[in-house]
Amino acid sequence: MGKQATPRALPENEAKAVARMLRVSPQKLNLVAQMIRGKKVDTALAELQFSRKRISTEVKKCLESAIANAENNHDLDVDDLVVSQAFVGKALVLKRFHARARGRGARILKPFSNLTIVVREVRQAEAA
């Protein structure tokens, strides 16, 4: 009588992870997401490890989660994984008040972002 299971949205050779409500603007997060797009996961992890961007640690956690999902939930080979998609979405924006001179006030916007990373298993024969 319950709901039927929805069909899998991703192909069988893909897995994904989503990080929501990251406290960074989408533009800044997209700089880091753009850096790992299309690369092998070990190369992407190394680049995130030595990146000087503050948000790169959160992106690294999300990528590690996608790798773990691929290995544990979908039985994919970790050595053949490639970051097929890494895209950023806008979440909410907190609006704060900053008191200024002469009784005025200024608005401070604190944006949040969502990050989705999709990894795909690419066999060596397909890559060559």
UniProtKB/Swiss-Prot annotation:
UniProtKB keywords: Ribonucleoprotein, Ribosomal protein, RNA-binding, rRNA-binding
Similarity section: Belongs to the universal ribosomal protein uL22 family.
Oligomer status and interactors: Part of the 50S ribosomal subunit.
Job of this protein: This protein binds specifically to 23S rRNA; its binding is stimulated by other ribosomal proteins, e.g. L4, L17, and L20. It is important during the early stages of 50S assembly. It makes multiple contacts with different domains of the 23S rRNA in the assembled 50S subunit and ribosome.
Pfam families: Ribosomal_L22 (PF00237)
InterPro entries: Ribosomal_uL22, Ribosomal_uL22_bac/chlpt-type, Ribosomal_uL22_bac/org-type, Ribosomal_uL22_CS, Ribosomal_uL22_sf
PROSITE patterns membership: RIBOSOMAL_L22
Claim: Glycoprotein is one of the keywords in the record: no
GO MF assignments: rRNA binding; structural constituent of ribosome
HAMAP family, per the entry: Ribosomal_uL22_B
Protein name listed in UniProt: Large ribosomal subunit protein uL22
One GO term (biological process): translation
